[in-house]
């Protein structure tokens, strides 16, 4: 639409210029001549008057057309939005996604006022950039528009000096010449030769200076090298034609501004300036000063300010302590900070001081950040959260500046709470290496230490931080006075998982009460963190929707657990009959060996459906959460793990690579027993745990001790495999029956195994997780209350055993 407008405007101006420089003006000049000449040229004047009337009539009609075109063009809403610097109005998406509640107007006004005061300087940069972007394209369009008038309209024709002399000057068609900017000669021609025209009188201004000639029509132009050369050639040409010196073609020198050339002179500067501004705006997202494209509107000069997420009592979608489960002890610790901020007088009367900080420590997914969000929802005081990586930047000095800005904001809003997520990004121990990035991180850490406990600290600001690597933090950061408390958030036990499942199951449409599923699912998911439980509930709902289920059932939850543990089910994977038979006998060996071992975990189901990237089948057990493991328990677990390889050797007669993962687990467990737990008599009561950071370049024992460890591990694994082969030989028929049934059904549950193997010969005196899975907590608690059980002897002072690790040789 814009190009159509410029095209029409160009044609209108071209037509009007023909009138301005043509016969219309000449006729008008004749109207202004002396009365003595009127009679001599009455016919020509009458023709001129008629010509003027016709041109004025056509000009009026063209003006009306141009006005109509302009009105039509600028009435286009797209063009008006294009040239407008106002933000576009939001579309009515609320019709499809209605809001539950409307915010109070007073809150909106207060939030708007607060935001306007905060971003007053930021809006100036946004306004300038928006104005520049809105004007950039129109300026380019105007440049193209003016380029059409750089040397006149499209009716002018460029000629050479030789053509000018032969075709225009010699016939006497040249009225006068205007030399523009000493570079272009504009030729104004007559409609008839000079010897056939009446004499034109040129009036002056009364001072002897003739006025500028207005006769002739501008139709041709040519470039000149220099003024002197042009005048010399023109004089020679007229002299050769025998023209009297008093009748030489008048030459006028004019200075004109060609907008196109002027614009092109400044175009490189404007282009460079626009590129720099555009690049700076695009870099705002990468500089940590806003989202992509500068969403938060902070310029590069405000890069020293921290990107803070604020929450207060007016915030939406709050999380409360009732929404957090599975970490009651940690929740009690963190609630004391909230109570102190709400009612400090109660503690001050007793002489107590609020701890300055608390460090939330725990594995990933246990709810550290969720607990911090609940603290923000319950406290009712300003809550400022930031990530540890937000302090680090490509510019030197940005980290300390952001730390100062963060604590300055917190002190202005005191009492307040600061939460730094993943503080290990800046809190690593100092003194390791001296590179530039390390120096910048150390400067940030030093500034954080000073702000938390230094000369300029003030009361009323509590600092919370979360990390899953407390071992690498600097000792100065962990001392009392900075982080007074370390709150450990472990993976939930079976009771904690039950509480977490109840929270997430409330949002799902079930065929039973949430408590019915929570008790059983908690028994099926040992070692799951809160994030894993949330994933299981979501996967179960997705599976139910995929199968067009009206409600979510236990089968959907079991499929979701299999999905989380084993990976995606791949029924379409092409497996040969021999491979499928090998997998069936392998999994059958695991099931039978574990069934007849006292300390093995109860089997829940076994399947030969491929899952994930490598698993062609697996057996699922319901393990108990034991804090201590005996040598006999670990030996039975080793035998159960080797059951698949033993079944392949005894029943098929050939072994395969399917036991690779089993052998890896066996090696890890056996090395841990010999080199970590001190179970070997030859090695003695020594423990060589591997380093957690992975920098295990040297062994903490001699080569002789390493050889003893290797020999002892081989002997233990050989004994376990010998016992496993004996069990498979003893129950060979049952192993084959289960394998053939697996080939038929692909999935076998414990009820199917009971029909072939019968009841397990061993019965635990205590309630196991499998019992809780079958009947739920409430019934098992009644049974355990009626049946006296032997209390296990637990040494409260003994630390839990290490996770089995591999000691490389």
Swiss-Prot record:
Annotated GO CC locations: chloroplast thylakoid membrane; mitochondrial inner membrane; mitochondrion
GO MF: ATP binding; ATP hydrolysis activity; ATP-dependent peptidase activity; metalloendopeptidase activity; zinc ion binding
Domain of life: Eukaryota
Protein residues bound to ATP: 362-369
Principal localisation: mitochondrion
Record: residues binding Zn(2+): 586, 590, 662
Ranges annotated as spanning the membrane: 132-152
Subcellular location: Mitochondrion inner membrane
Protein name, entry field: ATP-dependent zinc metalloprotease FTSH 3, mitochondrial
GO biological process: proteolysis
Coiled coil: none
Topology relative to the membrane: Single-pass membrane protein
Induction (record text): By heat and high light.
Pfam families in alphabetical order: AAA, AAA_lid_3, FtsH_ext, Peptidase_M41
PANTHER family: ATP-DEPENDENT PROTEASE (PTHR43655), ATP-DEPENDENT ZINC METALLOPROTEASE FTSH 3, MITOCHONDRIAL (PTHR43655:SF35)
Gene that specifies this protein: FTSH3
Biased composition annotated in UniProt, kind: Basic and acidic residues: 93-121
EC category name: hydrolase
Active-site residues, record numbering mapped to chain: 587
Cofactor note: Binds 1 zinc ion per subunit.
Cofactor(s) the protein requires to work: Zn(2+)
Claim: Ribosomal protein is one of the keywords in the record: no
């Amino acid at each position: 639409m814009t190009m159509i407008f410029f095209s029409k405007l160009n044609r209108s101006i071209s037509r009007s210029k023909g009138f301005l420089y043509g016969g219309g003006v000449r006729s008008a000049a004749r109207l202004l001549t002396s009365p003595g000449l009127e009679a001599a040229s009455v016919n020509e004047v009458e023709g001129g008057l008629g010509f003027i009337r016709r041109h004025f009539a056509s000009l009026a009609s063209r003006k009306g057309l141009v006005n109509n075109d302009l009105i039509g063009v600028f009435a286009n809403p797209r063009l008006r939005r294009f040239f407008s610097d106002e933000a576009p109005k939001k579309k009515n998406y609320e019709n499809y996604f209605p809001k539950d509640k409307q915010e109070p107007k007073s809150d909106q006004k207060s939030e708007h006022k607060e935001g306007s005061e905060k971003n007053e300087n930021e809006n100036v940069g946004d306004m300038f950039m928006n104005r520049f972007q809105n004007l950039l394209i129109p300026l380019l369009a105007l440049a193209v528009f003016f380029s059409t008038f750089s040397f006149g309209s499209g009716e002018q024709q460029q000629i050479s000096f030789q053509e000018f002399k032969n075709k225009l000057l010699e016939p006497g068609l040249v009225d006068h010449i205007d030399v523009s900017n000493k570079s272009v000669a504009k030729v104004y021609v007559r409609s008839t030769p000079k010897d056939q025209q009446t004499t034109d009188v040129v009036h002056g201004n009364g001072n002897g200076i003739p006025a500028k000639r207005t006769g002739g029509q501008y139709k041709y132009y040519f470039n000149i090298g220099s003024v002197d050369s042009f005048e010399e050639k023109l004089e020679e040409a007229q002299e050769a034609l025998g023209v009297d010196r008093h009748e030489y073609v008048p030459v006028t020198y004019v200075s004109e501004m060609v907008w196109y050339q002027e614009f092109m002179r400044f175009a490189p500067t404007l282009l460079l300036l626009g590129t720099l501004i555009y690049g700076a705006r695009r870099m705002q997202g990468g500089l940590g000063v806003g989202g992509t494209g500068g969403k938060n509107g902070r310029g590069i000069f405000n890069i020293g300010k921290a990107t803070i997420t604020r929450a207060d009592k007016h915030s939406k979608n709050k999380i409360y302590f009732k929404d957090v489960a599975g970490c009651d002890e940690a929740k009690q610790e963190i609630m004391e900070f909230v109570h102190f901020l709400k009612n400090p007088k109660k503690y001050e009367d007793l002489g107590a001081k609020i701890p300055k900080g608390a460090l939330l420590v725990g594995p990933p997914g246990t709810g550290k950040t969720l607990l911090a969000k609940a603290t923000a929802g319950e406290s009712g005081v300003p809550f400022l959260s930031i990530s540890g990586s937000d302090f680090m930047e490509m510019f030197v000095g940005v980290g300390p500046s952001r730390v100062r800005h963060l604590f300055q904001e917190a002190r202005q809003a005191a009492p307040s709470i600061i939460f730094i997520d993943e503080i290990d990004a800046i809190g690593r121990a100092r003194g390791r290496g001296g590179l530039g990035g390390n120096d910048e991180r150390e400067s940030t850490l030093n500034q954080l230490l000073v702000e938390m406990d230094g000369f300029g600290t003030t009361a009323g600001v509590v600092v919370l931080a979360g990390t899953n690597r407390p071992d690498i933090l600097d000792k100065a950061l962990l001392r009392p006075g900075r982080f007074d408390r370390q709150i450990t958030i472990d993976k939930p036990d079976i009771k904690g998982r039950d509480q977490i499942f109840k929270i997430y199951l409330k949002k799902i449409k079930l065929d039973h009460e949430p408590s019915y599923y929570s008790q059983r699912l908690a028994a099926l998911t040992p070692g799951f963190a809160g994030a894993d439980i949330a994933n299981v509930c979501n996967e179960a709902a997705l599976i139910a929707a995929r199968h067009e289920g009206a409600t979510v059932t236990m089968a959907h939850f079991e499929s979701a657990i299999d999905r989380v543990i084993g990976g995606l089910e791949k029924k379409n994977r092409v497996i040969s009959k021999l491979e499928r038979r090998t997998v069936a006998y392998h999994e059958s060996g695991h099931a039978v060996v574990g069934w007849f071992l006292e300390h093995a975990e109860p089997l829940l189901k076994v399947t030969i459906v491929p899952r994930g990237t490598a698993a062609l089948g697996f057996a699922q057990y319901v393990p108990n959460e034991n804090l201590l493991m005996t040598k006999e328990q670990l030996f039975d677990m080793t035998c159960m793990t080797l059951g698949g390889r033993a079944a392949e050797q005894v029943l098929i007669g050939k072994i395969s690579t399917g036991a690779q993962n089993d052998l890896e687990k066996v090696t890890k467990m056996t090395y841990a027993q010999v080199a970590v737990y001190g179970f070997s008599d030859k090695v003695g009561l020594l423990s060589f745990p591997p380093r957690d950071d992975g920098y295990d370049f040297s062994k903490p024992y001699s080569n002789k001790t390493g050889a003893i460890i290797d020999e002892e591990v081989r002997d233990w694994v050989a004994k376990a495999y010998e016992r496993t082969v004996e069990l498979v030989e003893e129950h060979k028929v049952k192993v084959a029956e289960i394998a053939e049934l697996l080939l038929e059904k692909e999935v076998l549950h414990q009820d199917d195994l009971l029909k072939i193997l019968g009841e397990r010969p061993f019965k635990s005196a205590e309630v196991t997780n499998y019992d809780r899975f079958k009947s739920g907590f409430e019934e098992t608690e009644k049974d355990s209350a009626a049946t006296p059980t032997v209390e296990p002897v637990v040494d409260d002072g003994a630390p839990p055993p290490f996770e089995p690790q591999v000691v490389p040789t």
